[in-house]
């Protein structure tokens, strides 16, 4: 089986394909998630404090998601077995998120406009990788699109700008990604 999740894991049985195809599809899906979130965060890091500020809210949401999954874990004695989560070590994930929030808050102090330091590609790709890893480990890959909606909007603005410009020669936004459009 393969699991697709939004708020709760939903098994997707690939009986005709067997276990090997399920593993291959999972690996492709995981690589797609990590690549997408890393690049989305990297695109968002073009404005002082934007990637760090948005990431604080994303990791805050994942702190609550992981803690809720700890409370509703299948290993808890008086939990409804039909509505429990089988996430491995959710409390550790919540602590990891809280540590990232603290680190980003300290970083944001020096990165707010006018920025004295910046995280660069290494920092933004690491933040995107952390979002991807958390979404995979908590089995909330599709919910991550809602939680990190600003990252998705930035990527979509760049894709729309490039696609429309190649097709018509006209720009939809004065500048892409979206946060640079609002600067002008």
Functional labels for PLM-detected ranges:
Residues 1-19, 75-80:
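Extracytosolic (periplasmic/ER-lumenal) interhelical loops and adjacent juxtamembrane/interface segments
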Residues 1, 23-184:
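Alpha-helical transmembrane segments
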């Amino acid at each position: 089986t393969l699991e697709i999740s939004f708020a709760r894991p939903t098994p997707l049985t690939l009986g005709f394909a067997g276990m090997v195809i399920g593993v291959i599809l999972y690996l492709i899906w995981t690589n797609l998630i990590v690549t997408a979130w890393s690049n989305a965060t990297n695109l968002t890091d073009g404005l002082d404090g934007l990637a760090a500020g948005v990431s604080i809210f994303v990791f805050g949401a994942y702190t609550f998601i992981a803690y809720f999954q700890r409370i509703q874990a299948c290993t808890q004695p008086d939990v409804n077995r039909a509505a429990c989560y089988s996430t491995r070590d959710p409390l550790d994930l919540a602590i990891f998120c809280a540590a990232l929030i603290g680190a980003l808050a300290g970083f944001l102090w020096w990165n707010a406009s006018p920025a004295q330091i910046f995280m660069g590609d290494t920092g933004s790709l690491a933040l995107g990788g952390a979002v991807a890893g958390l979404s995979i480990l908590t089995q909330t890959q599709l919910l991550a699109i809602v939680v990190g909606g600003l990252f998705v909007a930035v990527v979509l603005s760049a894709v729309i700008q490039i696609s429309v410009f190649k097709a018509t020669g006209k720009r939809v936004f004065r500048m892409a990604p979206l946060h640079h459009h609002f600067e002008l």
